[in-house]
Regions:
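N-terminal signal peptide c-region/cleavage motif recognized by signal peptidases
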Residues: 18-22
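Hydrophobic/aromatic beta-strand elements that line small-molecule binding cavities or substrate pockets
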Residues: 70, 102, 131-140, 164-171
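Terminal, regulation- and interaction-focused segments at domain boundaries
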Residues: 54-82, 103-104, 221-228
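Amphipathic alpha-helical segments
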Residues: 73-97
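Bacterial N-terminal signal peptides that target proteins for export
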Residues: 2-10
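Beta-strand elements of well-folded, non-transmembrane domains
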Residues: 72-76, 119-123, 137-143, 153-157, ...
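Short beta-edge strand/loop motif at the mouth of beta-sheet-based domains
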Residues: 88-130
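Terminal "cap-and-tail" regions of soluble proteins that handle hydrophobic small molecules
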Residues: 26-48, 52-54, 154-156, 162, ...
Length: 310
């Protein structure tokens, strides 16, 4: 891999971009993703941005979707080598403040991940105090020109279902254009629980997509469920980036580097993502890692490679 600077300048594209998935399902695939890139490339190149972001969300009949698009300073092949290894996903996802622990086990045609979630700023002392989210991981496309992985599960915490998390990428020169999307179906109890949570703990928290302009000419950002989901998907995206940036750090120092890198990236979006100071975040993650890491049983697997790698 080429030696590159790890200094990243990010922008959020708030202009309205004219691309939409066709009716009847989620759009994806190399041709569709290439068309999206052509639609937004001018905006993505505004300013000194090595990894610019475009974030959008929507809700239809109780299904919430949020996705982030960006340019990452790695080839698709480098992403393939890193992100087809199940352990890589446990390393990266647990950088997210609300993802406390992760385990995985092999199944016939997939890997079953269990993510342990909690909305607490304190270290998780026991898995009994966390919500479990079980997602099957599959590699759907694997070549030098297109890469796609999917996590999916039928049931989630707080009466949610049909959880889907996907990452796909196409080459753009020596880099990759990446889409990360998260979606789930909300039911009555989950909507009620989220409404209570937002009203109690984060009534003024905002997301990334702009929904208007106030009387002073300042942007108005989305709030509520869509704002919550946008914050989640951007945190997850930044976790992947932080993991990639620290892959070459010696093993004994990598965890500390990952945490600090994730925090650096998240603090670029202080209005949306700031929840605790650096030392608080790092101490929580250290304690959770030391206490919960032994729960992962050894798994003899290096990657989930399909046969169409090019």
């Amino acid at each position: 891999m080429k030696s590159r600077s790890y200094k990243i300048w990010m922008i959020i594209v708030v202009a309205c971009i004219a691309f939409s998935p066709p009716a009847g399902g989620d759009a994806s695939g190399p041709q569709w993703l290439a068309a999206v890139y052509q639609s937004i490339r001018g905006k993505l190149n505004d300013g000194a941005a090595d990894i610019p972001l475009y974030v959008r969300s929507d809700e239809h009949e109780g299904v919430f979707n949020a996705e982030v698009y960006g340019i990452v300073d790695y080839s698709v092949r480098v992403l393939v080598d890193a992100l087809t290894i199940p352990a890589s996903w446990c390393e990266s996802t647990t950088l997210h403040p609300n993802i406390k622990h992760c385990t995985y086990e092999l199944q016939d045609d997939s890997v079953l991940f269990t993510f342990y979630l909690a909305r607490s700023r304190k270290p998780l002392q026991s898995l009994q105090h966390a919500y479990e989210l079980k997602l099957k991981f599959r590699v759907l496309a694997l070549s030098k020109d297109y890469f796609k992985v999917l996590f999916e599960g039928n049931e989630g915490s707080m009466d949610t279902r049909n959880h889907r998390f996907q990452l796909e990428a196409i080459p753009v020169a020596d880099s990759a254009f990446v889409r990360v999307k998260f979606s789930y179906q909300s039911r009555l109890m989950s909507r009620l629980a989220t409404t209570i949570y937002l009203g109690t703990f984060s009534p003024n928290r905002i997301g990334f997509s702009m929904v208007g302009i106030d009387n002073d000419g300042q942007p108005i950002y989305v709030k509520g469920n869509k704002g919550l989901l946008e914050r989640h998907v951007v945190r997850s995206y930044l976790a992947v980036i932080a993991f990639m940036h620290t892959r070459d750090v010696p093993a004994e120092d990598r965890f500390e580097a990952q945490m600090n890198r994730w925090y650096d990236l998240a603090e670029r979006y202080v209005l949306q993502l700031h929840e605790m100071e650096r030392h608080e975040y790092i101490e929580v993650k250290r304690q959770e890692r030391d206490k919960l890491r032994p729960l992962q049983a050894p798994v003899a697997v290096r990657g989930m490679h399909r046969g169409d790698k090019g």
